[in-house]
């Protein structure tokens, strides 16, 4: 049996030969790795360095070696260099046209690469001395480039490349994505008629984006007040693509539009149909909750209680089930049924202790918050996932980068039964390595890998990975100076930036606590601090100190954490308006009547995260009954 790190030994022997100028010996070692270790996470690197070794040895097989690497790892970090060196190798063999085509791939697919300028220079030189054929870069390259530009918010550049795609004889290969993306670009610019045209061209293709296009068509129809067309699009989406995550959302939006214009009966009917059809989805479970809400707003508390109890049963395992049981308890209180109220609160508190309404229910009952902890070990036995075994060996040897690479490979290769445990290890690795944003995202992937109803019952290590104590010394110091709860601040930072100090929002908010420059400067003056420049805004200590000052000011102004968080998210002027619209509303009702869904969710999520931080790190994480 080979040692666990045998592939690493062979790989680094090849690297040593390469560094010593013994290129053919290096190529032989990389060949050995590729032949003997078919599950090695180093195969991509071995392919690349094999090609580089052959090129350095001026072996005529070098172009084919680069091609082999690019076929399998065309989007890898070494791809721009591989295309450039492939061009160099082809030039050396007098294959000018093929060399030019290799160079062309770099500025199209890797414009920001340091090899892009060199590739353009070589193309200029070749064009001066040879007659080059037309650019035959595959249409997929321009489509992928357009997607990258689109995701970066550069709509104009994306549009230009998509037009190039459409002019190609092979445009049909990517028509679905092209039509959809052009529709979204028009939607962004509020050119809804043109957006509709693109989406309607995409839907009949019945490919990857057909459900997305139907969803956008639903939204466009609602914007235009065409509820009938919106319902037709949403119904088609739910019928043709019932497994799409957008299926329930489209119907929900139509029902919501009906409720907003006062057609509560029609809205209630559609909410009920949507919820009962998609009870375990986010929007289906929310639709079930909305049925009870509409009934309660008209004073029909008994019917509302029944609707919420039914919603809690149908959407069991979802976050919405917790809110349904909580509001079923409130409705039961309204009709004088203390027994039903107590039972419903208890269900929310014990089954969904990690949710906002589960935590609120525990507070109503005067019981400590408890969250279900999975007692099973998160450890994966040796031999089950070879890449994980290599991670353990490398980690013990303090080979940090290689160890992390093996753990990343293990997260992709692990059997389904072990994937959540491997992802949890990777999450902790990222957080301990100074990347809590990536750590939280990976922990959420781990939670999702478990599936329902497991998301509310996790190993303790996974709970801690979901709620890491990043920047904790800075948070506690700033909280103490401002007289704030450090756990509330941790919850706010987790939701604002996921602890990424360099985060910058589309609106121009900076840093851990997402401060607008003007707000940061005025707060700095009030605290007797120098006004921060852009560098100061992303400095963790400065950002947290100023963010604590902003949050403290809102707490002083409004006196309640829900109102302060609403002001932090949407501004104090809007909070005052909402308070005038609903005078005397208690905290629960106030939150649910906020017209901005983002702010409603923000208040709940920040307070839920704060409660989880207290449970984990202050209260000693008492567990719910197993």
Give the residues covered by each predicted segment.
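Short loop-to-helix capping motifs
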Residues: 560-561
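Acidic, polar-rich low-complexity tracts and alpha-helical solenoid repeat scaffolds
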Residues: 1-507, 513, 523-532, 549-552, ...
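A short, structured beta-strand-centered segment in the mid-to-C-terminal lobe
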Residues: 532-542
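Gram-negative outer-membrane assembly/targeting C-terminal domains
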Residues: 601-604, 609-626
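CBM-like carbohydrate-recognition segments
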Residues: 571-572, 584-585, 593-610
């Amino acid at each position: 049996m080979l040692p666990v790190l045998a592939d690493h030994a062979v790989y680094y022997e090849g690297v040593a030969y390469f560094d010593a100028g013994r290129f053919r010996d290096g190529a032989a070692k990389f060949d050995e790795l590729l032949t003997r270790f078919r599950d090695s996470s180093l195969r991509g690197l071995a392919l690349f360095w094999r090609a580089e070794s052959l090129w350095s040895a001026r072996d005529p097989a070098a172009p084919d070696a680069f091609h082999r690497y690019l076929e399998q790892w065309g989007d890898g970090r070494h791809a721009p260099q591989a295309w450039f060196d492939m061009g160099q190798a082809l030039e050396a063999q007098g294959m000018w046209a093929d060399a030019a085509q290799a160079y062309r791939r770099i500025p199209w697919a890797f414009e920001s690469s340091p090899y892009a300028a060199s590739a353009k220079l070589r193309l200029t030189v070749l064009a001066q001395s040879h007659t080059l054929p037309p650019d035959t870069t595959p249409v997929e390259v321009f489509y992928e480039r357009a997607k990258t530009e689109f995701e970066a918010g550069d709509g104009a550049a994306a549009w230009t490349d998509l037009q190039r795609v459409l002019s190609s004889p092979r445009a049909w290969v990517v028509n679905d994505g092209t039509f959809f993306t052009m529709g979204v670009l028009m939607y962004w610019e509020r050119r809804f008629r043109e957006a509709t045209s693109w989406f309607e061209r995409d839907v009949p293709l019945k490919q990857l984006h057909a459900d997305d296009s139907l969803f956008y068509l639903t939204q466009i129809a609602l914007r235009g007040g065409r509820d009938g067309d919106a319902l037709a699009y949403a119904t088609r989406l739910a019928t043709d693509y019932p497994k799409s995550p957008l299926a329930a959302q489209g119907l929900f939006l139509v029902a919501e539009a009906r409720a907003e214009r006062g057609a509560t009966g029609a809205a209630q009917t559609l909410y009920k149909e949507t919820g009962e059809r998609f009870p375990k989805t986010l929007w289906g479970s929310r639709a079930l909750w909305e049925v009870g809400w509409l009934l309660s707003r008209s004073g029909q508390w008994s019917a509302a209680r029944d609707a919420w109890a039914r919603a809690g049963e149908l959407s069991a395992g979802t976050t919405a089930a917790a809110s349904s049981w909580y509001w079923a308890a409130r409705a039961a209180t309204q009709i004088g049924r203390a027994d039903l109220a107590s039972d419903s609160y208890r269900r929310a508190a014990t089954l969904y202790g990690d949710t906002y309404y589960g935590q609120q229910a525990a507070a109503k009952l005067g019981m400590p918050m408890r969250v279900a902890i999975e007692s099973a070990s998160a450890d994966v036995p040796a031999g089950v996932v070879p890449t994980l075994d290599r991670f353990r060996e490398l980690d013990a040897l303090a080979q940090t980068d290689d160890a992390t690479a093996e753990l990343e490979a293990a997260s992709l290769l692990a059997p389904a039964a072990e994937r959540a445990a491997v992802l949890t290890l990777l999450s902790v690795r990222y957080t301990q390595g100074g990347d809590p944003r990536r750590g939280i995202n990976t922990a959420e992937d781990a939670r999702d890998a478990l599936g329902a109803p497991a998301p509310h019952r996790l190993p303790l290590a996974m709970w801690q990975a979901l709620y890491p104590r990043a920047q904790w010394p800075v948070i506690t110091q700033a909280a103490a100076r401002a007289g704030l709860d450090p756990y509330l601040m941790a919850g706010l930072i987790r939701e604002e930036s996921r602890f990424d100090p360099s985060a910058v929002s589309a609106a121009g908010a900076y840093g851990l606590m997402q401060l607008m420059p003007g707000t940061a400067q005025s707060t700095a003056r009030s605290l007797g601090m120098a006004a921060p420049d852009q560098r100061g805004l992303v400095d963790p200590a400065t950002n947290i100190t100023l963010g604590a000052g902003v949050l403290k000011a809102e707490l002083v102004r409004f006196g309640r954490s829900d109102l302060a968080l609403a002001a932090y998210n949407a501004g104090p002027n809007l909070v005052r308006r909402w308070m005038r619209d609903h005078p005397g509303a208690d905290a629960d009702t106030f939150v649910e009547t906020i017209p901005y869904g983002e702010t409603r969710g923000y208040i709940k999520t920040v307070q839920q995260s704060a409660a989880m931080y207290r449970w984990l790190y202050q209260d000693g994480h008492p567990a719910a009954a197993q």
